[in-house]
Amino acid sequence: MDREAFVQTLTACRLCPRLVAWREEVVGRKRAFRGEPYWARPVPGFGDPEARILLFGLAPGAHGSNRTGRPFTGDASGAFLYPLLHEAGLSSKPESLPGDDLRLYGVYLTAAVRCAPPKNKPTPEELRACARWTEVELGLLPEVRVYVALGRIALEALLAHFGLRKSAHPFRHGAHYPLPGGRHLLASYHVSRQNTQTGRLTREMFLEVLMEAKRLAGL
């Protein structure tokens, strides 16, 4: 399956009734975006097709990616992430706006679940259902050498993808686990508002993760 076929098939997915209902139900709920069009479909990844770094998040935000159709775009997570990608030399611009000409260099963004879940909490069944899309999407990125999991659930989804045991690869910010073929798995706190506004994840902490990913990827 090529990239175009993947996007067409993914965005037509309705496997998870709860997620389908929620991604459509939230349209127009937030006053700031009332009247704006919403993507309200599964969100495909975004970035460099020859990426050597993959940033792997949890799921679209109801009024962020679910509205804009681009990962980490339209909410506080993106407002934190993109300036740091730009500072690290991985993005052409310090912000992501729907329909802009933003380019990512050597990095690709996607998530464990591709539809917005209620309370940002996908169920185990929803994670398993979306694992089929992870399999396809990561297969379209053969140059990736460094996988950066944003949060525990994202880490566990990647461990499942690689057939690795959770008990041998616990989540902690800054964790580094070797993968077969000279690849690497890094873990970071998620770039969510909950983490960045409380100081659990600072700009300096995340920039350090990005620079380590660049070093390991040979960028």
Curated annotation (Swiss-Prot):
Name of the protein in question: Type-5 uracil-DNA glycosylase
Gene behind this protein: udgb
Effect upon mutating D75E: Retains much of its activity
EC number of the protein: 3.2.2.-
Organism of provenance: Thermus thermophilus (strain ATCC 27634 / DSM 579 / HB8)
CDD domains: UDG-F5_TTUDGB_like (cd10031)
Binding site for [4Fe-4S] cluster: C13, C16, C115, C130
Gene Ontology terms, MF aspect: 4 iron, 4 sulfur cluster binding; deaminated base DNA N-glycosylase activity; DNA-deoxyinosine glycosylase activity; metal ion binding; uracil DNA N-glycosylase activity
Effect in UniProt of substituting D75A: Loss of xanthine DNA glycosylase (XDG) activity. Decrease in uracil DNA glycosylase (UDG) and hypoxanthine DNA glycosylase (HDG) activities. Shows low activity for the removal of uracil from U/G or thymine from T/G
Sequence similarity: Belongs to the uracil-DNA glycosylase (UDG) superfamily. Type 5 (UDGb) family.
Domain of life: Bacteria
